[in-house]
Amino acid sequence: MSDTSSPKPVASGEKFRTAQGITAIKDGQKRRASAEPQVFEPKPKWLRVKAPGGSRFEAVKRNVGEHRLSTVCQESHCPNMGECWSNGTATIMLMGSVCTRACRFCAVDTGNPNGWLDLEEPQNTAKSVELMALRYIVLTSVDRDDLEDGGASHYAACVRAIKENTPQVVVEALTPDFDGDHQAIERVVDSGLEVFAQNVETVKRLTHVVRDPRAGYEKTLKVLEHAKKHRPQVLTKTSLMLGLGETDEEILETMDDLRAIGVDILTLGQYLQPTRNHLKVQRWVSPEEFNRLRDIGLEKGFMEVAAGPLVRSSYRADRVFEKNNLGLAAPLPVPGQEVDASLIPALNLN
């Protein structure tokens, strides 16, 4: 008699083989040998979220599964998945669910896909966006250092497919750094998107602790700077996690570095440790402190600063652009990088 039981779930930190035959580490970090079990401190009350559920949540979940799509909502254990999916929105993760990098804050599986790509993904993604009746879609992806251009051509093909199928949909692309390759960056920026994002993740001092060695603080700044210089009308965006040991002064210095290269939008959120194998939370940042930092960021000239304990780079991204039902407000200009305001798309999302 054959065994019809469900396969045993893979434990965090263990090696496993994906459906595509890729060997990967579950949740991105190998299991740590520890003499004593790690004790997780209770989260503050402001970090409690409702369990996901509801008909709209199930519909989005079904749509994602039927079109073989990966979502950063699932792969990164995002605390906002229930809210976003229940509102009929999702952030789609391109180029599979296995990342070639292993950042110590991230719960995405890590391994070497050895060039694997789903060639039907551009059309499947475009069809899924249409079926979900989205007005604003955030695309992100794993890092693909195994591909010659870091996956830029495939990424751009996905954006073009969405625009060809549903030209009214606003596209935000949260991309890898493409190892700083200018041609790869331009390929994505020229694909028809409205917002180009690359996350700095943390302050300069902590970058080597938090991110994969192949990433870099200056590298991310140069990627964002080149994207803005190449196509000034495209909005640039980045995200910073708090609670990793950064100081207030370092946060403000990071804001200054970002404004110096013309970054338009900044998101600030609380770092949450996804598994015991990842970096520990150093402190809980209060909603009041996030509000204070948002005010400072706006004073420094960001078009918008989305800040809060549960804010993630793609959390309710469409709302960032709702400015009194009039579309986008122009950011303060950076000397030498002034942009004709008429070139900035007015995204009325009502």
From Swiss-Prot:
CDD domains with a match to the protein in the record: Radical_SAM
Homology family: Belongs to the radical SAM superfamily. Lipoyl synthase family.
Magnesium recorded as keyword: no
EC number, UniProt record: 2.8.1.8
Keyword Kinase: no
Domain Radical SAM core, residue spans: 85-303
Pfam families named in the record: Radical_SAM
Cofactor-binding details, from the entry: Binds 2 [4Fe-4S] clusters per subunit. One cluster is coordinated with 3 cysteines and an exchangeable S-adenosyl-L-methionine.
Official protein name in the record: Lipoyl synthase
An MF annotation (GO) of this entry: 4 iron, 4 sulfur cluster binding
Cellular localization per UniProt: Cytoplasm
Binding site for [4Fe-4S] cluster 1: C73, C78, C84, S314
